Amino acid sequence: MSKLFGNKSQRDLKEVKPFVDKIKVAYGEIERLSDDDLRGRTAILRQKIQDYVKDERAEIDKLKVEVEGKDLDEREEIWAQVDKLEKEILDKMEVVLDEILPEAFAIIKDTARRFAQNETIRVKATDLDRDLAINHDFVSIEGDTAVYQNHWVAGGNEILWDMIHYDVQLIGGTVLHKGKIAEMATGEGKTLVATLPVFLNALTGNGVHVVTVNDYLSKRDSEWMGPLYMFHGLTVDCIDKHQPNSDARRKAYNADITFGTNNEFGFDYLRDNMATSPKDLVQRKHNYAIVDEVDSVLIDDARTPLIISGPTPKGEDQLFEEFLPNVEKVVEAQRKLCSQLLIDAKNKMASEDKKEQEEGSLLLFRSFKGLPKNKQLIKYLSEPGIKSSMLKTEEAYMAENMRNMHLVTDELYFIIDEKRNSVELTEKGIDLLTSRTDDPKFFVLPDIAAELSALDNMESDAEKRREAKDEIIANYSIKSERVHTVNQLLKAYALFEKDDQYVVMDNKVLIVDEQTGRIMDGRRYSDGLHQAIEAKEHVKVEAATQTFATITLQNYFRMYHKLAGMTGTAETEAGELWDIYKLDVVVIPTNKPIARKDMNDRIYKTAREKYAAVIEEIVRLVEEGRPVLVGTTSVEISELLSRMLRLRGIQHNVLNAKLHQKEAEIVAQAGQKGTVTIATNMAGRGTDIKLSAEVKKAGGLAIIGTERHESRRVDRQLRGRSGRQGDPGSSIFYVSLEDHLMRLFATEKIASLMDRLGFKEGEVLENNMLSKSVERAQKKVEENNFGIRKHLLEYDDVMNSQREVIYTRRRHALMGERIGMDVLNTIYDVCKALIDNYAEANDFEGFKEDLMRALAIESPITQEIFRGKKAEELTDMLFDEAYKSFQRKMDLIAEVAHPVVHQVFETQAAVYERILIPITDGKRVYNIGCNLREADETQGKSIIKEFEKAIVLHTIDESWKEHLREMDELRNSVQNASYENKDPLLIYKLESYELFRKMVEAMNRKTVAILMRARIPVPEAPSQEELEHRRQIEIRHAAEQRTDMSKYRTQKDDIEAQQKAQRDAASRPQGAAAPQTPIRNENKIGRNDPCPCGSGKKFKQCHGRNL
């Protein structure tokens, strides 16, 4: 088939070739233009785009004027037309962009040529040139002439522009414009490629986002490529240079081209959806994004949702430090036990007796289940025949659905499953844990379902049963938190290692990204795991927080009208990128053939031998005068190799999560003669390693990988550091049987193959079969990780549909354009819910009572009509009356407020711009800020609009915050469904829909209840003096109100919360719901304090029992 139709890469290039041919034709014409005429072409293209969509824009403006004064149904139709026209504008713009692509690409290519070939470019000065000259050294003004230099500072270094786009870069640029992923090898100039589609799409004025993996690159690239865009009158900024929620960041988003990191784009979106004033918003609509290192952002970072969290009153109330000694005791006992088991296993397996050997294999397997990372165990398993013997034992005990596995694990204190990232306490472990307490069931969850069932069968009065039930639930809640704390502490000790998954710096636990080796600033493990690690490391245990807003990067980037990306390594993940983002991967050919030599893996028996061989290879390469880049997978290994090199007297640089400040400088020097650089996987994404002629002659940059990573993509990224633009180079990986990947995923087949080949200590093995086995193990892990990311997305998709509804409604309220329509819809929904709840049961009395609570009106419907009409007719009748009542109350507020507003405006308009109007629902006073002039000119109508906005925003934020907490609890509790042979995701979808429906219904009722009871508070018979006082004090000027974001914090919450099914289910009875741990907003009452109800009992024995 590929011979007949060509392979995918060939078909992709065939599709793009016509565009490249047209660009070359256009370039011939553009080259002949003067510098001023070249800039003039940009203005012509911008106008052409606007002219193409001017009819639709005019129609939208006309519809927005028409919508005022229309009834509810007509308003909805008009706004639907507006939404449709806005989508049509975007689609039409894509058509015109394709038309002008050859000319736009030719303009930016020729601009690059002119900067490369001329020290200065002189053009007629515009206002933008004059503004640029104030803050940028590369532009100066001489009379009416703007002089652009061809050198400027980018990322702290002076750069001389010397780049012109190659043909393959024109291909890459076209692919990016089409909303695809361009895979380009390292050194092929991805940053320059991006200038083509960025320039073209920025001409629309809708904004282009260039997304990078770190703030150094976002700042550097905005400064490096910025002058090319600025020369043509486009504005460029970088969000990472400015504080969140600041005017400077707002301005950065309004620029034609905005650079920034993925996290900050996502967090700004969440902050915008917590804003209480339109002036707090920073982002525009999501138009077009180009994601640099797209695999890192959309795949690696997609496993960790973005979260904005805030303080919670019970945040300090934690048990980690209290139970730490108990857990340390269990961990220490397990270490001693497993060490002894290993010694006994070795003795028995050395015996000639087959039965003794079998017993030894069982002891070895038991030691493995208890402490799989024990270095002595790992070393022993690399000896001939040992691992294959243990794997056979494991197979025997896993047979028949692990019926006999308890014979292996009963002797242990806890069981570790590295593959599933879980730890489970055994009965023996629980006994040791509780040995310090008086209660043998101190750390055991009660069977709540059985206890409640037994209670229901008791023959006692209802009041006693209720009290007993409250006691059972309170006990379960306390014990559940206790068990959860112990489980997390156990995980912190058993599965997380310092200088591997995390580092401790400045008395803080900082997570290290497993893919890049970088510190993940601001990110914390979820579900108490981070606090557990803090307790383990004896640093300050931070307070727990509550989620206020959350989104996955996957769903954030799917909001863009058009999304594209570029990377050196995406082909291996092409399936995932298409499945989740509908992004096609196109492999762009290199400008020059790759001359790098990729050698077979060298496989050693132990890690010690492997590292010794790595050091010898480094010494040999340095003697040849070649630079060496050594890639490691953890901080610990980079430090080990550094110590070994120091012993040999070899100078070197280390780049890891602890030593990352001079990253760009170290990577830039990594190509010099005899330079040795040890780096975790963070090394050099986005930074080129350039070689001198002398180094090229010696053989180029040598890459040494000290371990295969779980992802083939990360290995390809490391190899790709060498061999840029046809340079010579080499790459090789050193692997041992003790490596993490080999230990977890190497099968019995590999172990027995090693034995057959007679693999002895000190020997090196280069074998195609083994290399393929390593690659198969990597594929297994990749599939597993894809499953985790897809699973996370499936859960977040449920959340996303709810988030869209809430955020759309919130945005309408914030902007105010559609607030009137949304309020009327809310009143209608409440009316419909009231009729639906009572009409079917013919409960007219219940309906009347609930109607007074919800809408504060008498029933306009008689009992006869209530029983004789259809539900739809009843809803319409009720809505008509509710609408009239609402309108009367709003008119009355405007009528009462306007005279006072008018007086303040007449006498103090020069002093005050805004005014606060107090409005109450009888329970609470809301101070509504509005523009003084507008309030006077609209006869008080603008006050009503501001009041509606404030109430809708208030009820949405309160309801959504509580809903997020309930959704978190639901997500954890549904995992038990898998033990009942049910699909947890399906249960989650059904339950979450019901939760959301109830939340919206309650939110609607709360909104309407406040609006329908609204009035301006007026004291009875006020004296003239009091009236004057109220006018001056109660109705006073108000400064511009802005949202205070300082009390919220951002974090990238680890996927850990989504992987806790096994441990939760293991410690919770089947069918029992996860305990609710309510986050309360009132002052905290101690459990031993007197109950505030006045009973004289302690709080824990009275109203505190069910908390």
From Swiss-Prot:
PROSITE patterns in the record: SECA, SECA_MOTOR_DEAD
Cell compartment(s), UniProt: Cell inner membrane; Cytoplasm
Cofactor note: May bind 1 zinc ion per subunit.
Membrane topology, record value: Peripheral membrane protein
Cofactor section: Zn(2+)
Residues that bind ATP: Q169, G187, E188, G189, K190, T191, D688
Primary location: membrane
Subunit structure: Monomer and homodimer. Part of the essential Sec protein translocation apparatus which comprises SecA, SecYEG and auxiliary proteins SecDF. Other proteins may also be involved.
Name of the featured protein: Protein translocase subunit SecA
Record organism: Porphyromonas gingivalis (strain ATCC BAA-308 / W83)
Gene from which this protein is expressed: secA
